[in-house]
Amino acid sequence: MAPDTRAVLLTLYRYQEAFSALDSNAAHAVWPSVDVKALDRAFDQLEQQTFNLQGCNVTVSGTRADASCSGSAIYARKVGNTAVHEEPRQWRFTLQQRGGQWLIDRVDVR
């Protein structure tokens, strides 16, 4: 595996861990353009959340990269229906290398 591909996958792992920990600051560290206040509000609605990104396909072109991952989101809300839900998800990431590290520019989730 090429070093840049490995570095992109590490960034995606950090994204997964940040969202699983409901940690908006950690999410901002890998996705600088994310709206931290909106993310805090969303995280405040959740009792727990786990993102499972699997089978990520990464394409690196110079200082840009695209990645698509399948997986699931498991979550429970604090209010209302507090049952644990699991939903399949597809993630598409656009990343850019800045200052020697790969950062997320855009995320599309379906």
Language-model-detected regions and their locations in the chain:
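Residue-level detector of alpha-helix boundaries and kinks
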Residues: 11-12, 80
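Compositionally biased, proline/threonine/alanine/serine-rich low-complexity intrinsically disordered stretches
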Residues: 1-3
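Short solvent-exposed beta->alpha transition segments
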Residues: 9-10, 17-72
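Exposed beta-sheet edge and beta->alpha loop/turn motif
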Residues: 64-110
